[in-house]
Amino acid sequence: MIREARLDEAEALAELQRDASVAAFAHIFPPERYPYPLDEVLARWAEAVENPNLTVLVAEVAGTPGGVAGCRAEWLDGLYVRPEHWGHGLGRKLHDEVLDRLRVKGSPRCHLWVLEDNERARRFYEGLGWRENGDTRVVPFPPNPIDVGYTIELETTLATP
Protein backbone atom coordinates (compact mmCIF):
# COMPACT_ATOMS: atom_id res chain seq x y z
CA MET A 1 0.00 0.00 0.00
CA ILE A 2 1.28 3.47 -0.88
CA ARG A 3 0.18 6.36 1.30
CA GLU A 4 1.34 9.74 2.56
CA ALA A 5 3.89 9.69 5.36
CA ARG A 6 3.06 10.68 8.93
CA LEU A 7 5.22 12.83 11.19
CA ASP A 8 5.52 10.01 13.73
CA GLU A 9 7.35 8.00 11.03
CA ALA A 10 10.24 10.45 10.53
CA GLU A 11 12.66 8.27 12.51
CA ALA A 12 11.67 5.13 10.58
CA LEU A 13 12.08 7.02 7.29
CA ALA A 14 15.54 8.28 8.28
CA GLU A 15 16.60 4.75 9.21
CA LEU A 16 15.17 3.40 5.95
CA GLN A 17 17.14 6.01 3.98
CA ARG A 18 20.28 5.16 5.95
CA ASP A 19 19.96 1.44 5.26
CA ALA A 20 19.31 1.99 1.55
CA SER A 21 22.06 4.61 1.24
CA VAL A 22 24.72 2.57 3.01
CA ALA A 23 23.90 -0.44 0.82
CA ALA A 24 23.79 1.56 -2.42
CA PHE A 25 26.55 4.11 -1.85
CA ALA A 26 29.22 2.30 0.21
CA HIS A 27 31.55 2.38 -2.81
CA ILE A 28 31.08 6.17 -3.03
CA PHE A 29 30.78 7.06 0.67
CA PRO A 30 32.66 4.34 2.59
CA PRO A 31 30.91 4.34 6.00
CA GLU A 32 34.18 4.08 7.92
CA ARG A 33 35.32 7.37 6.32
CA TYR A 34 31.95 9.09 5.97
CA PRO A 35 29.60 8.12 8.81
CA TYR A 36 25.95 8.40 7.90
CA PRO A 37 24.44 11.68 9.25
CA LEU A 38 21.34 10.09 10.78
CA ASP A 39 20.39 13.08 12.97
CA GLU A 40 20.52 15.49 10.01
CA VAL A 41 18.49 13.13 7.83
CA LEU A 42 15.92 12.66 10.61
CA ALA A 43 15.49 16.44 10.88
CA ARG A 44 15.04 16.70 7.10
CA TRP A 45 12.36 13.97 7.01
CA ALA A 46 10.47 15.58 9.91
CA GLU A 47 10.55 18.91 8.06
CA ALA A 48 9.58 17.32 4.74
CA VAL A 49 6.56 15.48 6.15
CA GLU A 50 5.19 18.74 7.57
CA ASN A 51 5.97 20.88 4.50
CA PRO A 52 2.78 21.53 2.47
CA ASN A 53 4.87 22.08 -0.69
CA LEU A 54 6.31 18.55 -0.53
CA THR A 55 4.71 15.15 -0.85
CA VAL A 56 6.27 12.26 1.04
CA LEU A 57 4.95 8.84 0.09
CA VAL A 58 5.50 5.59 1.96
CA ALA A 59 5.28 2.10 0.51
CA GLU A 60 4.11 0.01 3.41
CA VAL A 61 5.25 -3.60 3.78
CA ALA A 62 3.78 -5.66 6.62
CA GLY A 63 2.68 -2.46 8.38
CA THR A 64 6.04 -0.67 8.26
CA PRO A 65 7.74 1.61 5.72
CA GLY A 66 9.54 -0.49 3.11
CA GLY A 67 10.15 2.43 0.79
CA VAL A 68 9.81 6.21 0.74
CA ALA A 69 9.79 8.90 -1.94
CA GLY A 70 9.69 12.67 -1.72
CA CYS A 71 8.56 15.00 -4.47
CA ARG A 72 7.70 18.62 -5.16
CA ALA A 73 6.70 20.54 -8.28
CA GLU A 74 8.54 18.87 -11.17
CA TRP A 75 11.11 17.14 -8.92
CA LEU A 76 11.55 13.65 -7.54
CA ASP A 77 13.77 14.55 -4.59
CA GLY A 78 14.53 11.04 -3.43
CA LEU A 79 13.36 7.45 -3.63
CA TYR A 80 14.66 4.89 -1.15
CA VAL A 81 13.74 1.24 -0.68
CA ARG A 82 14.99 -1.06 2.06
CA PRO A 83 17.65 -3.32 0.51
CA GLU A 84 15.72 -6.48 1.37
CA HIS A 85 12.92 -5.23 -0.92
CA TRP A 86 15.15 -4.32 -3.89
CA GLY A 87 14.12 -6.01 -7.12
CA HIS A 88 10.54 -6.74 -6.03
CA GLY A 89 8.74 -3.79 -7.65
CA LEU A 90 8.38 -1.57 -4.59
CA GLY A 91 10.53 1.20 -6.03
CA ARG A 92 8.60 1.06 -9.30
CA LYS A 93 5.29 1.43 -7.45
CA LEU A 94 6.57 4.45 -5.53
CA HIS A 95 8.01 5.95 -8.70
CA ASP A 96 4.76 5.52 -10.61
CA GLU A 97 2.69 7.03 -7.79
CA VAL A 98 4.98 10.07 -7.62
CA LEU A 99 4.67 10.67 -11.36
CA ASP A 100 0.89 10.16 -11.27
CA ARG A 101 0.59 12.77 -8.52
CA LEU A 102 2.75 15.23 -10.43
CA ARG A 103 0.60 14.69 -13.55
CA VAL A 104 -2.55 15.43 -11.55
CA LYS A 105 -0.94 18.70 -10.42
CA GLY A 106 -0.25 19.58 -14.05
CA SER A 107 3.52 19.08 -14.12
CA PRO A 108 4.62 18.51 -17.74
CA ARG A 109 7.89 16.86 -16.72
CA CYS A 110 9.87 15.68 -13.73
CA HIS A 111 13.57 16.00 -12.91
CA LEU A 112 15.90 14.21 -10.53
CA TRP A 113 19.55 13.90 -9.62
CA VAL A 114 21.37 10.55 -9.53
CA LEU A 115 24.92 10.00 -8.36
CA GLU A 116 27.07 9.38 -11.43
CA ASP A 117 28.51 6.17 -9.93
CA ASN A 118 25.13 4.79 -8.81
CA GLU A 119 24.76 2.42 -11.75
CA ARG A 120 21.85 0.51 -10.23
CA ALA A 121 19.73 3.65 -9.86
CA ARG A 122 20.71 4.91 -13.30
CA ARG A 123 19.59 1.61 -14.89
CA PHE A 124 16.36 1.75 -12.86
CA TYR A 125 15.42 5.26 -14.01
CA GLU A 126 16.58 4.80 -17.60
CA GLY A 127 14.48 1.62 -17.78
CA LEU A 128 11.46 3.69 -16.76
CA GLY A 129 11.98 6.26 -19.50
CA TRP A 130 14.17 8.88 -17.80
CA ARG A 131 16.90 10.46 -19.92
CA GLU A 132 20.03 12.38 -18.98
CA ASN A 133 19.34 16.08 -19.48
CA GLY A 134 22.95 17.29 -19.69
CA ASP A 135 23.03 18.84 -16.21
CA THR A 136 25.64 17.85 -13.65
CA ARG A 137 26.58 19.20 -10.25
CA VAL A 138 29.13 18.50 -7.57
CA VAL A 139 27.55 17.05 -4.43
CA PRO A 140 28.31 19.54 -1.63
CA PHE A 141 29.65 17.03 0.88
CA PRO A 142 32.81 14.90 0.86
CA PRO A 143 34.05 13.18 -1.14
CA ASN A 144 32.11 15.48 -3.49
CA PRO A 145 30.90 13.00 -6.14
CA ILE A 146 29.07 14.13 -9.27
CA ASP A 147 25.28 14.11 -9.64
CA VAL A 148 23.81 13.61 -13.11
CA GLY A 149 20.50 15.27 -14.02
CA TYR A 150 17.64 13.26 -15.49
CA THR A 151 14.28 14.33 -16.91
CA ILE A 152 11.13 12.49 -17.93
CA GLU A 153 8.34 14.09 -19.96
CA LEU A 154 5.08 13.31 -18.17
CA GLU A 155 2.67 14.09 -20.98
CA THR A 156 4.13 11.19 -22.99
CA THR A 157 4.32 8.78 -20.07
CA LEU A 158 1.34 6.55 -19.38
CA ALA A 159 -0.17 6.86 -15.93
CA THR A 160 -0.35 3.79 -13.72
CA PRO A 161 -3.46 1.76 -14.60
Which role does the model predict for each range below?
Residues 6, 77, 82-86, 115-116:
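Residue-level recognition of the GNAT/N-acetyltransferase active site
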Residues 108-122, 126-131, 135-161:
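C-terminal "cap" of GNAT-fold acetyltransferases
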Residues 15-44, 54:
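Conserved GNAT-fold acetyl-CoA-binding loop/helix
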Residues 93-109:
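Conserved acyl-CoA
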Residues 42-58, 75:
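A short helix-loop-beta-strand connector motif used in the catalytic cores of GNAT acetyltransferases and
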